[in-house]
Design a protein with these regions (language model features):
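Gly/Ala-rich beta-loop-alpha elbow adjacent to hydrolase catalytic centers
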Residues: 7-12, 16
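Short beta-strand immediately N-terminal to the catalytic nucleophile in serine-hydrolase-like folds
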Residues: 6-8, 31, 122
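Short beta-strand/loop motif that positions the catalytic acidic residue
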Residues: 115, 121-123, 127
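Conserved alpha/beta-hydrolase "acid-adjacent" motif
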Residues: 128-137
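Active-site nucleophile elbow and catalytic-triad environment of alpha/beta-hydrolase enzymes
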Residues: 91-116
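Catalytic active-site module of serine/aspartate enzymes centered on a nucleophile-bearing elbow/loop
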Residues: 145-178
Length: 178
């Protein structure tokens, strides 16, 4: 079978990076991905800049409930309806505490173990969780340029202008012959 093209968002971006340590891929798209250096810097930044959001997200990751406004603040820069937020919130589930620790410090991806395929690294100007500076750091780590979408937040694929990053991914796949 042909090697896959991986598209990973946030934690899924870390999964894609870990996959590359032991598997081949035809291409990888990292969208607002946890950086290869881990969550530590992003978590500290969020704790200092928006401590209420950080506290609520920790509760949510542990299976607790949070106000929809917290979800809106953490994920979106563009207007989003309460109905959409409620629908997405219902689909959320607790995260693995081990996975969070692994992404923070203990099991980070090692570039030396990877055979790097073509990579596209995307981020959002108003990302509260993985700021553009972290996305740019990820891109530099892999020797590519980050592409930051203005006026968008962490939930790139759910924002009102989701077609902009989706279109860029489609264009990139074509450029790579994928």
């Amino acid at each position: 079978p042909a090697a896959p093209v991986l598209v990973g968002h946030s934690m899924g971006g870390m999964v894609a990076q870990k996959y590359l340590e032991s598997h081949a891929a035809a291409g990888v798209v990292l969208m607002s991905s946890v950086p290869p250096q881990g969550l530590w810097a992003a978590a500290l930044g969020l704790a200092f800049q928006k401590p209420g959001v950080m506290s609520d997200l920790n509760s949510l990751l542990g299976g607790g409930r949070v106000a929809l406004d917290t979800l809106r603040s953490a994920m979106f820069a563009q207007p989003v309806t309460t109905e959409d937020l409620a629908r997405w919130y219902k689909r959320m589930q607790p995260e693995s505490h081990r996975a969070i620790w692994d992404m923070t410090l203990f099991n980070l991806p090692l570039k030396s173990r990877m055979t790097l395929p073509p990579l596209l690294v995307l981020g959002a100007e108003h990302d509260t969780l993985i700021p553009a500076s972290q996305v740019e750091m990820t891109a530099r780590h892999y020797g590519v340029e980050a592409e930051i979408f203005p006026g968008m937040g962490h939930g790139l694929m759910l924002e009102r202008d989701w077609e902009r990053p989706a279109g860029r991914i489609l264009d990139w796949l074509g450029e790579q012959g994928l």
